């Protein structure tokens, strides 16, 4: 169980990073959103030009240009670009917007060099500039989003949750992906009930927006109900998952839960559904289903499943499996096939 939890925690981290596309942190000068307009001071033309020169050093391909136009030639290395920007932040006459844009570009530079601690520091300075002056709302939101993503990526989950709270206050409305991140951060902190609250909120947001639930968003509920030992809700969500995302792992999990609850008919139906969808690929799986069908007193179906497994070369033709086949045919009163199976089994004795 601990191994499975560790694997899921790793999977959660990866899925969150993919969902938020951390690598897509951008450097574009942010524009105001349609809310109460902020009176943001302008960026001087000379500063903008110097920032562009630094950006070219950091990543020439990030500069906007016409289709087919080559990337500009940098006049230094990415580190040179960062050093240039750092010097510019020391100027005394910078307004809050200029300072925030400089630190935003520095965050891009540090991220390009894969220096996560300095990237975080730079984004913190973007937010700090907004505390002492006025910066664009879009840039502040971008910085806060980057901060909760980056802190999550280095397993600083409490810090990530703090920045999420700030981002949500600024955003003014729910966001399913962010609520999912809150849920997974609380999961990593083993705050399972709090995590479940946000996991359910994800579903509420999705339904309100008339969207489809993503697979990993729904599966998180399964994991959390399991942690809380709420087996009825584990089953309820799995029953939905096998319809919306009919994968073998969910069917197997559901069948196992039915077995645990001693709902043998449901368990057998689930295993047979897996088989009918062509999801069984192992000898042990087909033999298990055949034995379950035999125990349920449907020997003809048990024989059919096993015979097909032998034909498909999934089931090994050995004495044990052929004896089982012979027993199935005997109990289904198909004596000709039973005799044939007994004879085949005797060849391996």
Q: Residues of each region from the PLM?
A:
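N-terminal leader/linker segments that initiate helical-solenoid repeat arrays
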Residues: 16-19, 24-124, 128-131, 137-142, ...
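Generic helix N-cap/helix-start motif at coil->alpha-helix transitions
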Residues: 45-52, 96-103, 135-146, 171-181, ...
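Conserved small-residue packing positions in alpha-helical repeats and bundles
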Residues: 54, 69, 107, 148, ...
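Helix-turn-helix repeat elements of alpha-solenoid scaffolds
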Residues: 58-65, 69-86, 111-128, 149-164, ...
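Solenoid-like repeat scaffolds
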Residues: 36-42, 89-95, 127-136, 165-173, ...
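C-terminal structural cap/anchor segments
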Residues: 317-349
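Bacterial N-terminal signal peptides that target proteins for export
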Residues: 2-14
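Solenoidal tandem-repeat scaffolds enriched in leucines and small polar residues
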Residues: 166-277
